[in-house]
């Protein structure tokens, strides 16, 4: 899956979110969003791919500081076996080959990809299609995780606190990046309200005090889910 390219907490009939174990995330630039979206949708609805019922999403990436990243494609896998199976299926799929050709014709350029796993999840973000992601370098995971979990649980007390908080570990890709945190919202306005207010909360002040020097911020970006498949 070298040429295909954070998101996926979407409403369904489950009582609780059914989070994936592994997430394969592909970041790229696309100057023609409709064409890239059409290429991805065509592949996901091709018979050989559709029958696999992969959970996946195409998202727009905003305000992340790099002009060569505009979108991401994310696949969510419940097990290592499912991930391995998908790699084999995509490598031999005619629809995947066509997808690569159509993305290239649309001017898409891959930037980087990584593999992540969820470590901590607070709240229920199904149906919340807007997110803010904080990418970090964590040097002391135990200290950082405990501080984050406390903050996330209490941040829901705020009117701008969002719907869900996810902490991911990054297994591959991204240089010194080790983890990322995403907060999900029902609208872009809610995400902006959060960004404007969270630094002034007692919850964040406590997090900074407890986390201390256990982490270094790397970058922050906003995202919006555009296309979603088989949400779980």
What does each model-identified segment do?
Residues 1-6:
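Bacterial N-terminal signal peptides
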Residues 7-205, 210-232:
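Short S/T/G/P-rich N-terminal loop/turn motif that feeds into the first structured element of a domain
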């Amino acid at each position: 899956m070298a040429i295909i390219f954070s998101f996926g907490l979407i409403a369904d009939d489950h009582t609780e979110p059914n989070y994936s174990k592994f997430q394969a995330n592909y970041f790229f630039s696309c100057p023609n969003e409709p064409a890239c979206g059409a290429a991805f949708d065509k592949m996901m609805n091709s018979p050989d791919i559709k029958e696999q019922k992969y959970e996946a999403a195409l998202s727009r990436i905003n305000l992340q500081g790099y002009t060569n990243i505009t979108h991401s494609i994310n696949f969510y896998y419940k097990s290592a076996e499912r991930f391995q199976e998908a790699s084999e299926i995509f490598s031999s799929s005619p629809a995947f080959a066509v997808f690569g050709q159509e993305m290239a014709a649309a001017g898409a350029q891959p930037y980087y990809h990584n593999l992540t796993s969820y470590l901590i999840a607070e709240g229920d973000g199904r149906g919340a299609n807007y997110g803010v992601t904080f990418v970090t370098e964590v040097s002391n995971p135990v200290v950082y995780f405990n501080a984050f979990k406390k903050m996330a649980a209490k941040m829901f007390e705020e009117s701008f606190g969002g719907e869900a908080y996810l902490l991911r570990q990054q297994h591959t890709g991204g240089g010194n990046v080790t983890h990322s945190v995403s907060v999900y919202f029902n609208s872009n306005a809610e995400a902006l309200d959060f960004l404007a207010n969270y630094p002034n909360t007692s919850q964040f002040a406590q997090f900074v005090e407890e986390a201390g020097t256990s982490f270094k911020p790397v970058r922050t970006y906003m995202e919006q889910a555009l296309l979603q498949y088989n949400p779980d």
